[in-house]
UniProtKB/Swiss-Prot annotation:
PANTHER family: ATP SYNTHASE SUBUNIT ALPHA, MITOCHONDRIAL (PTHR48082:SF2). CDD domains: ATP-synt_F1_alpha_C, ATP-synt_F1_alpha_N, F1-ATPase_alpha_CD. Belongs to the ATPase alpha/beta chains family. Keywords: ATP synthesis, ATP-binding, CF(1), Chloroplast, Hydrogen ion transport, Ion transport, Membrane, Nucleotide-binding, Plastid, Thylakoid, Translocase, Transport. The gene is atpA. This is ATP synthase subunit alpha, chloroplastic. It comes from Oenothera elata subsp. hookeri (Hooker's evening primrose). HAMAP family: ATP_synth_alpha_bact. It is found in: Plastid, Chloroplast thylakoid membrane. It comes from the Eukaryota. The record marks S363 as: Required for activity. It is an enzyme of class 7 (translocase). Its EC number is 7.1.2.2. InterPro entries: ATP_synth_asu-like_sf, ATP_synth_asu_C, ATP_synth_asu_C_sf, ATP_synth_F1_a_nt-bd_dom, ATP_synth_F1_asu, ATPase_a/bsu_AS, ATPase_F1/V1/A1_a/bsu_N, ATPase_F1/V1/A1_a/bsu_N_sf.
Length: 505
């Protein structure tokens, strides 16, 4: 018969008591009262905070946006079809964040930074909050470096600098996205990371943009964040912040970034939908009262960082669609007041064959010539003045038949200058090519040509200078000044090409 030893038993009990760990885990939970239209009402979740992520029983994640006395309004990051009334919800103690890394370059992702291009998972060891505060005044420096778009009309007259926010605004089908994609194409070799955010666009339109970038090798330095028109409103609302978080990751690593939001008015519509379903009081055009803050906190994140922070930059180009040219609507006026200038695209100019259809008269850059190299300043001033005088004269000439010779010459010059601003899509020009084009027009070398011949002559002149006078481009790129030597080279090239051109014709 086995003997029971009291000391052994007491030792075992003592060990067990020492091992006992009284851990109390408090989980903040709630119960689904109602779900539908991408919104859930939750009873409980007493300790939840505004903007906190909550997790439903079947795995769907939501964001707590409305904290009311009797329930919590949650917007869902998915369709929520499997969420049932009465199921449990728990607070996660986290706010929305995404993984970030260099591996995102060349990929197409959604608002949660998950790849949607079928090319496998993206590895990353770091993460960033989707919403983070914009750099303060001390953290910034004024914009002084140009961000070249490759479009003469913009780089000469409405220059954009690194760290600026420039709005692209116009009716539908006026070439807004084309201006943005041309700007991305022109960053090739400039060490600029581009982020294109498509909000509520047709999936076919996004695919078209991605294909255009892939064909020209621009996806190597580009990230596309896409939430199509059929995506939940919550994800359309988050997509721009996801793009901004990715661009910020590179900006704080002393890199230059360009982010295109296409377009914030669709984000505002998604936010309006969420707000109305959460029963927040509607304001002007049924948008909620904080729709200005929605865009300002996004666009303020674009900055040129101070030298202490490494001089990285984030340039933002939001695209806003207007209805029949009405720029006084709520969202356009909001975004105009937040940005540092706007580029107006006109349907009338587009239909008249002037493409890019930029209305230079009412477009403006609040940074101005600070965002131009000296060589461009030297030639662009005259172009601006002559085009402004031409626009005035053209309006006057409609009412008058007998114009003197000087006025006729000025009108003829203006028509040729307008012609040199035309560019084909996906054919951005280098700064040197733009300078030689503007110089040729403003100094009267095009006056002897028919309007129909202008573009052909300029194309051939640019090729001629590139092959026969490579020193011209070298001088501009090395000194950034339109020197007398460069001017002499260009004059010779124009004369030689003119003779060749006239012989061919």
């Amino acid at each position: 018969m086995a003997t029971i030893r009291a000391d052994e038993i007491s030792n075992i009990i003592r060990e067990r008591i020492e091992q006992y760990n009284r851990e109390v885990k408090i989980v903040n939970t709630g119960t689904v009262l109602q779900v539908g239209d991408g919104i859930a009402r939750i009873y409980g979740l007493d300790e939840v905070m505004a903007g906190e992520l909550v997790e439903f029983e079947e795995g769907t994640i939501g964001i707590a946006l409305n904290l009311e006395s009797k329930n919590v309004g949650v917007v869902l990051m998915g369709d929520g079809l499997l969420i049932q009334e009465g199921s449990s919800v728990k607070a996660t103690g986290r706010i929305a964040q995404i993984p970030v890394s260099e591996a995102y370059l060349g990929r197409v992702i959604n608002a949660l930074a998950k790849p949607i291009d079928g090319r496998g998972e993206i590895s990353s060891s770091e993460s960033r909050l989707i919403e983070s505060p914009a750099p303060g005044i001390i953290s910034r420096r004024s914009v002084y470096e140009p961000l070249q778009t490759g479009l003469i009309a913009i780089d000469a007259m409405i220059p954009i600098g690194r760290g600026q926010r420039e709005l692209i605004i116009g009716d539908r089908q006026t070439g807004k996205t084309a201006v943005a994609t041309d700007t991305i194409l022109n960053q090739q070799g400039n060490n600029v990371i581009c982020v294109y955010v498509a909000i509520g666009q047709k999936a076919s339109s996004v695919a078209q943009v991605v294909n255009a970038l892939q064909e020209r090798g621009a996806m190597e330095y580009t990230i596309v964040v896409a939430e199509a028109a059929d995506s939940p409103a919550t994800l359309q609302y988050l997509a721009p912040y996801t793009g901004a978080a990715l661009a910020e990751y590179f900006m704080y690593r002393e890199r230059h970034t360009l982010i295109i939001y296409d377009d914030p008015s669709k984000q505002a519509q998604a936010y309006r939908q969420m707000s109305l379903l959460l029963r927040r009081p509607p304001g002007r055009e049924a948008y909620p009262g904080d729709v200005f803050y929605l865009h300002s906190r996004l666009l303020e994140r674009a900055a040129k960082l101070s030298s202490r922070l490494g001089e990285g930059s984030m340039t933002a180009l939001p695209i806003v669609e207007t209805q029949s040219g009405d720029v006084s609507a709520y969202i356009p006026t909001n975004v105009i007041s937040i940005t540092d200038g706007q580029i107006f695209l006109s349907a009338d100019l587009f239909n008249a064959g002037i493409r890019p259809a930029i209305n230079v008269g009412i477009s403006v850059s609040r940074v101005g010539s600070a965002a131009q190299i000296k060589a461009m300043k030297q030639v662009a001033g005259k172009l601006k003045l002559e085009l402004a005088q031409f626009a005035e004269l053209e309006a006057f000439a409609q009412f008058s038949s007998d114009l003197d010779k000087a006025t006729q010459n000025q009108l003829a010059r203006g028509q040729r200058l307008r012609e040199l601003l035309k560019q084909s899509q996906a054919k951005p020009l280098t700064v040197a090519e733009q300078i030689l084009t503007i110089y040729t027009g403003t100094n009267g070398y095009l006056d002897s040509f028919e309007i129909a011949q202008v573009r052909k002559f300029l194309d051939e002149l640019r090729d001629y200078v590139k092959t026969r006078k490579p020193q011209f481009e070298e001088i501009i790129s090395s000194t950034k000044i339109f020197t007398e030597e460069a001017q002499a080279l260009l004059k010779d090239a124009i004369q030689e090409q003119k003779e060749l051109f006239l012989v061919q014709e």
